[in-house]
Amino acid sequence: MTNIRKTHPLXKIVNHSFIDLPTPSNISAWWNFGSLLGICLIIQILTGLFLAMHYTSDTTTAFSSVTHICRDVNYGWLIRYMHANGASMFFICLFLHVGRGLYYGSYTYFETWNIGVILLFTVMATAFMGYVLPWGQMSFLGATVITNLLSAIPYVGTNLVEWIWGGFSVDKATLTRFFAFHFILPFVIAALAMVHLLFLHETGSNNPTGLISDSXKIPFHPYYTIKDILGLLILILVLMILVLFSPDLLGDPDNYTPXNPLNTPPHIKPEWYFLFAYAILRSIPNKLGGVLALVFSILILILFPVLHTSKQRSMMFRPLSQCLFWILVADLLTLTWIGGQPVEHPFIIIGQLASILYFTIILFILPIASMIENKLLKW
């Protein structure tokens, strides 16, 4: 008799995705982040659901409803901080997942990669709208500043911003619609993640060497299920240390002040995971130019398959490209640091240089280095 997991229509899908899936035998811990992102999404949806049961999306009561969750709801503080820090863990996993894709040339799977970029944009949009919901001072000003960027779009900009706001300023209508979108988008992300997996399973996973691994594949279960559980335990450990020991480490103290349109904090800055993009935005004095640079700083990921000039897929055997990759990582860390600094003398020029370096490495230096490597290897 055939096993039910191979015959039952539903169990068959799960079987082909997580149990009998042929997987390369040499994939490293860098391949753990896909499953960790799935776990992060589940944690965020569950904690978010329980928060939504107690939250009110009205400008007069939003801030106090969050206070009520933290003080009066059973384990409300735990749910709230798991949700807030869960977002940080989500982005850490996302950045590492994308970095892995860049390093090992996974972007040659066009459909999987492009859906991944769309996923990145969707997660960023969701996180931004979630940050507005507590209606603290930084929430309010973040919403005002970031939505205002759309006014840089020629001709339709101002109308577009007022349409998004639902009025002439960030107010009750804005908060309500942000809550609605913040609630629905994680489910859109889950659906997109399924499409992401669908396309990935058409081709099979890449591996550190970038070579075809059809000759040596092993079943996903038990080998990689065990490996993923280890990753999960580390993720939960780090998240819970963050939540239980320093839940406000990554937050902004200004967000403990209720939003006041008449008062502006000296430094407006987003959450840490947007700082690199924020630094690129600020490094261009022109509003429209800044917005374009901001969008292109992430949209540039779509160009990687086109810019790939090497005869090898992975960077595993390409020391020159490896060196440039780590310079790019250091550059992104520099941008993240600059994004959190005030707009003053040394920081402005550092931010501008780091932004120029970011685009130059990706668009020019990496493709040229790959060609040089081809020449050196006489390919």
Curated annotation (Swiss-Prot):
Q: Which organism is it from?
A: Spermophilopsis leptodactylus
Q: Which UniProt keywords apply?
A: Electron transport, Heme, Iron, Membrane, Metal-binding, Mitochondrion, Mitochondrion inner membrane, Respiratory chain, Transmembrane, Transmembrane helix, Transport, Ubiquinone
Give the function comment from the record: Component of the ubiquinol-cytochrome c reductase complex (complex III or cytochrome b-c1 complex) that is part of the mitochondrial respiratory chain. The b-c1 complex mediates electron transfer from ubiquinol to cytochrome c. Contributes to the generation of a proton gradient across the mitochondrial membrane that is then used for ATP synthesis.
Anything else known: Heme 1 (or BL or b562) is low-potential and absorbs at about 562 nm, and heme 2 (or BH or b566) is high-potential and absorbs at about 566 nm.
Q: How does it sit in the membrane?
A: Multi-pass membrane protein
- Recorded protein name is Cytochrome b
Binding positions (heme b b562): H83, H182
Binding, heme b b566: H97, H196
Give the GO biological process terms: mitochondrial electron transport, ubiquinol to cytochrome c
Q: Give the residue spans that cross the bilayer.
A: 33-53, 77-98, 113-133, 178-198, 226-246, 288-308, 320-340, 347-367
